[in-house]
Structures are given as C-alpha cells and as structure tokens.
C-alpha cells in the first residue's frame, strides 16, 4: 500500500472478516490479535476480539507498525 486511500480501501473491503493483526511494538515486542474488523471511521478502524476492542489508525498500516492477514 502506498497511499492512505489504498489502506482505507483494504480495510473497508475486509470489513466483517476475520483477520490476524500483527503489531510490531517497541523493543522487538510483537503481539498478534485475532478478531473481526467491526467498525471503520475516517481516521481509525476497530478490531473486535472475544475479550476486547482495539483501535488502529490507517497510518499504522501504511508505516508497517501493523500488518493484517485476512483469514
């Protein structure tokens, strides 16, 4: 993805689908979240898991802070 519009289109096209979100944290700490893309807004989108909701910005996707694998 090269633009914010491509990132938004990717998320919107996978709305309601089960995804794995790999989060690259500080000091090489990685976290993987399995959930469903449940909400899309202007600047953020929300992934629902069984236990909690987690919000991400489209910028995170562009910068490679998170990676989304659609299942």
Language model region names:
Residues 1-30, 50-71:
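Short glycine-rich, low-complexity segments
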Residues 18, 43-44:
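Structural motif
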Residues 45-49:
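SH3/SH3-like beta-barrel fold
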